[in-house]
C-alpha cells in the first residue's frame, strides 16, 4: 500500500532553502518513503514518535501514521542543527 506524503509548512520552507542538488536527492528519498516508510536506513528518534533518514549531511525527520497511510515530513536540515528543539 502506498502512503501519502505531506509536509509541515516549516519542512516545506526548509526544503526550498536547500541547494538544488541536495534538494533533488532529498525529494527522491521522500518520494521513496511513500512506498516504504521504514527503509533500512531509517532510525526511530528516542523520546519521540519521529523517524529520520540520512541524505548526505542532511536529515529528514518524519512521522509515520499507519492508520491513515500518511508520512508527515516534520523537518529537513543539516545534521548539525536538525535535532534542536525536537
Map each language-model feature to its residues.
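Enriched for short, Lys/Arg-rich terminal
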Residues: 1-5, 10-24, 40, 55, ...
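A short, surface-exposed loop/turn module that caps and links secondary-structure elements
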Residues: 29-54
